[in-house]
Curated annotation (Swiss-Prot):
Protein name per UniProt: 3-ketoacyl-CoA thiolase
Described purpose of this protein according to its UniProt entry: Catalyzes the final step of fatty acid oxidation in which acetyl-CoA is released and the CoA ester of a fatty acid two carbons shorter is formed.
Lineage of source species: Bacteria, Pseudomonadati, Pseudomonadota, Gammaproteobacteria, Pseudomonadales
Catalytic activity: an acyl-CoA + acetyl-CoA = a 3-oxoacyl-CoA + CoA
Entry GO terms, CC: cytoplasm
Localization annotation: Cytoplasm
Biological processes annotated in GO: fatty acid beta-oxidation; phenylacetate catabolic process
Species annotation: Pseudomonas fluorescens (strain ATCC BAA-477 / NRRL B-23932 / Pf-5)
Length: 391
């Protein structure tokens, strides 16, 4: 494959183990420390990359307050081997924040505004709760349905519109845990998880190199016993078919193809296209459909050209309609989220975009895929997608 000098390549990817937000492994670790540890370790294992060459650290984070406030990208960067002469910015596109961080770096590289970037994101939902400090404008109800701000109800709406049953959602939830457990047992996450010290349930310090969020004992029967989480009367979305509230961070080293060649680095993949799109906030979970269609058009590809997909599992009731309208539902078991997704691993907001993209690249490497798409829905009605080609 021939690459153009300003093509954007992914050099490496790493993430923390995913921790439960309630009493989980990261309960005594701050978001900046988690981020700095990840950046440092990823740079250590890529010795050909000079930290002084990093143009910018672009970090996704949604709730930018408390320990995640005051530009956590810069806070974390200053705690690493990256010199203070490099810059740092924190970005938020809610659930799509760290994928937007990747897009921002890619756009800079494409336009000659830097060659080497560190991108990723973090969310410590145990320390900074989802609604901490949030004050929604009551006037918004003049422009969007009140329930649009309640993600679970938007998932209920989307599932109802597309005829998604409770049984289908439960099966999807079981699949996520089973595949994530299988990937763990088979060592499929070995290259992406950067081990971190944390505390076990007894309060003992230990080195975690696995996700504590996966529940391999999950069954259809256990999920069927759960009550609806958002709509008590007739709802179908439960805690077992929703993304978990977790703590975690993810990181990528991104550079121009020319700089990678100069350094003698073999990249993981090249970005072929990117896109964002908006939808009615009432069906926010549908955003990946127009975003992916737009990205595929920009890449000159069709849906059948894509070997593997990573779709953020915000809710089973949201993921299934997306797969249905992208015409890949019948190929789900061969192409989609082969290592499970956010139902099993969790959805630390600022972390997830880079997390699913990096997991996708490892799935492509392990299974010999050429093209892959990572995509996710975004609160208040957006979607974001990236098309990768394996190098």
């Amino acid at each position: 494959m021939s690459l153009n000098p300003r093509d954007v390549v992914i050099v490496d990817f790493g993430r923390t183990p995913m921790g439960r937000s309630k009493g989980g492994m990261h309960r005594n670790t701050r978001a900046e420390d988690m981020s700095a540890h990840l950046i440092s370790k990823l740079l250590e294992r890529n010795a050909k990359v000079d930290p002084a060459e990093v143009e910018d650290v672009i970090w996704g984070c949604v709730n930018q307050t408390l320990e995640q406030g005051w530009n956590i990208a810069r806070m974390a960067s200053l705690m690493t081997q990256i010199p203070h002469t490099s810059a740092g910015q924190t970005v938020s596109r809610l659930c799509g924040s760290s994928m937007s961080a990747l897009h921002t770096a890619a756009q800079a590289i494409m336009t000659g505004n830097g060659d080497v970037f560190v991108v990723g994101g973090v969310e410590h939902m145990g320390h900074v709760s989802m609604m901490h400090g949030v004050d929604p404008n009551p006037h918004m109800s003049l422009y969007a349905a009140k329930a649009s701000g309640m993600m679970g109800l938007t998932a209920e709406m989307l599932g109802k519109m597309h005829g998604i049953t409770r049984e289908q959602q439960d099966a999807f939830g079981v699949r996520s845990h089973q595949l994530a457990h299988k990937a763990t047992v088979e060592g499929k996450f070995k290259d992406e998880i950067i081990p971190m010290q944390g505390y076990d349930e007894n309060g003992f310090l230990k080195l975690f190199d696995y996700d504590e969020t996966i529940r391999p004992e999950t069954t259809l029967e256990s999920l069927a016993a759960l009550k609806p989480a958002f709509n008590p009367k007739g709802g179908t979305v439960t805690a077992g078919t929703s993304s978990q509230i977790t703590d975690g961070a993810s990181c990528m080293i991104v550079m121009s193809a020319q700089r990678a060649q100069d350094l003698g680095i073999q990249p993981m993949a090249v970005i072929r296209s990117m896109a964002v799109a908006g939808v009615d906030p009432a069906i926010m979970g549908y955003g990946p459909v127009p975003a992916t269609q737009k990205a595929l058009k920009r890449a000159g590809l069709g849906i059948n050209d894509i070997d593997f997909f990573e779709l953020n599992e915000a809710f089973a009731a949201q993921a299934l309609p997306v797969l249905k309208d992208l015409k890949v539902l019948d190929k789900m078991n061969e192409k989609v989220n082969l290592h499970g997704g956010a139902i099993a691993l969790g959805h630390p907001f600022g972390c997830s975009g880079a997390r699913i993209s990096g997991t996708l690249l490892n799935v492509m490497k392990q299974n010999g895929g050429t093209f892959g798409v990572s995509t996710m829905c975004i609160g208040l009605g957006q979607g974001i997608s990236t098309v990768f080609e394996r190098v």
